[in-house]
């Protein structure tokens, strides 16, 4: 059965070929380059109106890079938007991707934020998906070069190999959630 799957977040979500990977479903992509947690909060009414049967989110990396927010501010913002989404869509399964690895400059902050949001998201009934662990270099807490679109700067954008690796890890969780949906 065709399901409505909504992706929401920043450029990392925006760049994913979700409809290609999920052709048997209706896919809406609310991923926008440069978006922050505040931007996503502004899109919540649109997300709700799209009537998702499954919501997949990744947001927060631009809060560090674009606005230089503190870890506390990023945690507060992520949890605020997660709480609002959960309140407005109490029965919709949500998969929340952790912040993904970037450069050395941000990696420790990403790890700290991920550790702090995970238990709260789980308490909200949101599935926490550890994208950081999937995309990080095995020897350092940065994005693995072979998954990086901009390897000279250890940037945050994924290349095709990065998206494929992420989706291969994410797709079983997507399928689990889709299988649990009751008509």
Predicted feature residues:
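Conserved SGNH/GDSL esterase-like catalytic core that processes O-acyl groups on lipids
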Residues: 1-80, 103-111, 115
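N-terminal cationic-hydrophobic initiation segments that often serve targeting/anchoring roles
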Residues: 48, 86-87, 118-121
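Alpha/beta-hydrolase-fold catalytic nucleophile elbow
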Residues: 58, 97-98
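Hydrophobic positions in alpha-helices of CheY-like receiver
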Residues: 81-85
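A short helix->loop->beta-strand "cap" motif at the edges of active sites that frequently abuts
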Residues: 89-93
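Catalytic His-Asp segment of secreted/periplasmic serine-dependent ester chemistry enzymes
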Residues: 103-183
